[in-house]
Regions:
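Secretory/organelle targeting and membrane-embedding segments
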Residues: 1-145, 149-487
């Protein structure tokens, strides 16, 4: 890995940069993964000075630094340029600053660009980086872009085309912070390093897979953005389908980025494109209505600030995906994601097929649960015997949870992903083929929903979504394993 690099952050005054990027860069610096041969150029429209920018950086890492001196030494590597992304003259000044810092920090012409801005500016920035020779083929040149990567296949394709005019596919890192989470990356270990699971990870033994992304909060201050996006675009097109690909892929030939990508790509290629009838049967949308939780009243989605009072945007999405592969043909991959649900949490449940009863005693299916957030860990439910003289069965659970100390020591997702980019490891990033396939599927669902050909189910705040989501699983003789509203 080369830690000799000039990092340029477009959108350096924004919330993401201050909450995530500067702390993540500091952790890399503190651990020695960023050497003294680095500098960060922050650009944004605000007319900040270098001194003020340094103070913003110091404030963002105040809880992480061992001393004020350490924080200030780190911040001294940060430089600021007020920048209008559509003004060519500003790129000329940026090139001059880049060249100066490259010489000052002996960065060997290595460049990393992070676009922490609205996607409509990505193409403009990439075009100017090339035309003003900031991207010049010297050293490594890598680009990190934030989601959302388009709003449908057409916009994503145009965005990709614009980036490819300056960068090669192998230089583009489409970030999905969920893929940087420690427990997501442990899925490989759970699956492929344990004979117990690897030999039964198929349709012969697995009845269904359940993926839940639950949020307790509403849309908060994101009403304007969310009303143009909705749960399907915001959570399913990226996080859900990326997680599904890790759960459904075959074992790669090796654990190199190319072999892992190849197996993930096969999952996206084999996603079944549902018919119009299946779209109506197997995909559910919902929107939270007003209500009370523990005596406190919460407003409906349509009453949220910056939301259309007649909005049909979904705050809840649920459905069943299928994969036409030898491993998982006919196995439903259920998903649900929503706002204002009972409890915040991201869980995966692998529900194994139910065995026949023994001695007249009904058996519950074995379930492997992968906890991704807020706690991390796994549990495996088994059928055991109650203590006593009679042969009565009772469920038992084998649990492993990461304690708070260990969780705190795990790399932040952005820290891990920036480290991967510096190491030129694109394993935990979305390749264009994956993005394209996911949008093709999401567009089919969105087309039907935008025409209001399926009901928009209301659900009470504090629930786990509309009843239709539970009825969906009942069609397959299944039920949601995680039901915190009944705990």
């Amino acid at each position: 890995m080369s830690s000799k690099v000039i990092i340029t952050i477009f959108g350096a005054s924004g919330d993401l940069a201050q909450r995530k990027l500067y702390p993540s860069l500091f952790r890399l610096y503190k651990s020695g993964n960023l050497s003294k041969h680095f500098a960060v150029i922050g650009t944004a429209r605000r007319p900040w000075s270098k001194e003020y920018f340094e103070s913003v950086v110091v404030e963002s890492i105040s809880d992480l630094a061992d001393s004020a001196e350490q924080a200030q030494e780190f911040a001294s590597h940060f430089f600021y340029q007020s920048h209008d992304v559509q003004d060519t003259e500003h790129y000329i000044e940026l090139r001059k600053l880049q060249n100066k810092l490259n010489d000052q920090y002996q960065a060997e012409n290595n460049k990393l660009f992070f676009l922490s801005m609205a996607p409509q500016f990505f193409g403009t920035i990439a075009k100017h980086l090339k035309s003003e020779q900031i991207v010049d083929g010297k050293g490594f040149e890598r680009l990190i872009v934030e989601k959302p990567f388009g709003t449908d296949l057409a916009t994503a394709s145009k965005l990709n085309e614009d980036l490819l005019a300056t960068f090669d596919e192998e230089q583009i890192f489409r970030i999905d912070h969920y893929l940087g989470k420690e427990m997501i990356q442990k899925i490989f270990a759970i699956r492929f390093a344990n004979l117990l699971f690897e030999n039964v990870w198929n349709r012969q033994y697995i009845d269904n897979v359940q993926i839940t992304f639950a949020e307790k909060l509403g849309v908060e201050e994101r009403g304007g953005y969310y009303d143009q996006s909705g749960a399907l675009r915001d959570m399913v097109q990226n996080h859900t389908l990326q997680l599904l690909s890790l759960l459904a892929m075959d074992k790669p030939k090796s654990f190199t980025k190319d072999d892992i990508r190849a197996e993930k790509a096969k999952v996206f290629e084999r996603l079944v494109q549902p018919s119009k009838e299946d779209l109506k049967r197997f995909f559910i949308r919902g929107q939270y209505k007003s209500g009370k939780i523990n005596g406190r009243k919460y407003i409906s989605y349509r009453s949220e600030p910056n939301v259309n009072p007649e909005s049909t945007t979904e705050t809840f999405a649920s459905g069943a995906f299928f994969i036409d592969s030898d491993r998982f043909r006919d196995v439903p991959f259920f998903f649900r994601t929503g706002k204002r649900l009972t409890k915040k949490g991201t869980h995966v449940n692998i529900v194994f097929k139910q065995m026949d009863s023994i001695f007249g005693e009904p058996l519950k299916p074995n379930v492997l649960t992968i906890y991704i957030q807020p706690t991390e860990g796994i549990s495996l439910s088994l059928n055991g015997k109650e203590v006593g003289e009679l042969f009565n069965l009772a469920p038992i659970s084998l649990d492993y949870r990461t304690d708070a100390t260990a969780s705190g020591a795990s790399p932040d997702p952005y820290e891990k992903l920036i480290f991967d980019v510096l190491n030129n490891d694109s394993t935990n990033f979305s390749h264009w083929d994956e993005v394209k396939a996911s949008w093709e599927l999401i567009d089919r669902i969105e087309e039907l929903w935008s025409q209001n050909q399926v009901p928009l189910h209301e659900y009470p705040v504090g629930s786990m979504g509309p009843e239709a989501s539970f009825e969906l699983l009942a069609q397959f003789g299944a039920s949601w394993q995680w039901q915190p509203d009944k705990e």
